[in-house]
Amino acid sequence: MIIQEDDFKAEQLSDDSIFWDLNLLRTKKKRDGTIVDELGDTIYGLPLDSVMKRIVANRIARNNKDKAITMKQYLDEWKQEMVKLSNLSLSDK
């Protein structure tokens, strides 16, 4: 199974596995100087809760790329992003 959104792709190792391979969206600078967003290197063999934590951390980092934030701001954003991910199943109801 594959779970994919705009900023990540998670692929289950096998149908009965609890482990996932994860690709996160990364900003890369090409040799010609253009900047592109593309899925980065694969992180192998993560349980689903670790996949979610890495997605949240990546989203926070991308949203605050060129600025410093406080620990409180980081934790507030962490909570908001985790709620968004956790509530995806509720959005269809």
Language model segments and positions:
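Short, charged/polar N-terminal "headpieces" of proteins
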Residues: 1-19
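Coiled-coil-like amphipathic alpha-helices with heptad-repeat character
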Residues: 7, 21-26, 49, 74
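Mixed-charge, Lys/Arg-enriched low-complexity segments
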Residues: 32-93
